[in-house]
Amino acid sequence: MNDRRSSVFEWLLGDWTLAREISGYATATGVARVFLIDAQTARYEEAVRISLAQGETLSGTQCYLFRREPEAPAKMRILFCSTAELFQSLAFQERGGIWQASARFVCGADQYDSEYILDLQSWQVRHAVRGPRKDYRIETVYRRATGAG
């Protein structure tokens, strides 16, 4: 990464604001924090306020583990917090100053095709979710929290 951090994993550490859209269903805003829990693992925690399309407002939280690949600075794995099972394995490539990775996760009959895009002050995650009863997109934009990073 170009901001003096040596890996994608290290670049993600810190405090973030987030804005999320779940196509046709909801929007969410909130905060996320990525912090080290050991030399190879960071914990991602988010707290959001969700506005459903029908007008109801809820709050929610989510957690993942980010595991670095020590010998490959552009690679990392995302694990579910509750089980430490693999969600997605990412191999970022730099294209014109932007770092991108894509991955797929299959859960039963549902498929999550994901794209991760990082630049110097923000990152995006886009999930296309498809299955027998699912067909929507989840798009989240993260920006460094003021004074962070």
Model regions: which residues?
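Short terminal or interdomain "cap/linker" segment that borders an active site or interface and mediates
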Residues: G149
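Soluble ligand-binding/transfer domains with enclosed cavities or grooves
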Residues: N2, S6-T146
